[in-house]
A protein has these predicted regions:
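Active-site-proximal or metal-binding-adjacent scaffold patches in catalytic folds
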Residues: 1-107, 116-153
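Walker B catalytic acidic pair
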Residues: 112
């Protein structure tokens, strides 16, 4: 079995019994052995951990780049929405976003950060988005392709 993490296919291998937890090492995902249902739960938890670390870092980097203040990043299990932004500056991202390529992940992060400037989807917002993510359409296509992989997790 393989999984997709930040756009890369990675093999899933059994973790040594003494490790007791999932981990990423040398381009492989190691999961403790268990039933299919247990492995699915472990894989989701692995994705959530990876998402929190990666997306928090990227959101902070992009926020600093744009001079935008954010109030934390939360990881959700949303299936229909990649991300959202609260009026108070909290960013929410689905852990499933971690399956997308890095440029598509950044496009979603930047999209949500632009809501800190323009809290709607007006023409002004779209102009900001286009200026800061010139390849937004290509990223949207990548995200649609990524969404096809949701069924098994």
């Amino acid at each position: 079995m393989t999984v997709r993490l930040v756009g890369k296919e990675m093999p899933v291998l059994p973790a040594p019994p003494e490790s007791g937890r999932s981990r990423l090492e040398k381009g492989c995902v190691y999961l403790p052995e268990g039933t299919r249902e247990e492995q699915t739960v472990l894989l989701r938890e692995f994705y959530k951990e990876q998402a929190h670390a990666y997306l928090s870092l990227r959101a902070e980097e992009w926020a600093a780049h744009f001079g935008i203040e954010i109030r934390g990043v939360k990881i959700t299990s949303a299936r229909k929405r990649w991300g959202s932004c609260s009026s108070r500056g909290g960013l929410n991202f689905s852990w499933r976003l971690m399956m997308a390529p890095p440029e598509a992940i950044d496009a979603v992060i930047i999209h949500e950060l632009m809501h800190r400037i323009e809290f709607n989807h007006s023409k002004t917002f779209r102009a900001l988005e286009k200026k800061n993510v010139p390849n937004y359409e290509a990223c949207q296509k990548q995200l649609r392709e990524t969404a096809r992989h949701f069924s098994d997790i």
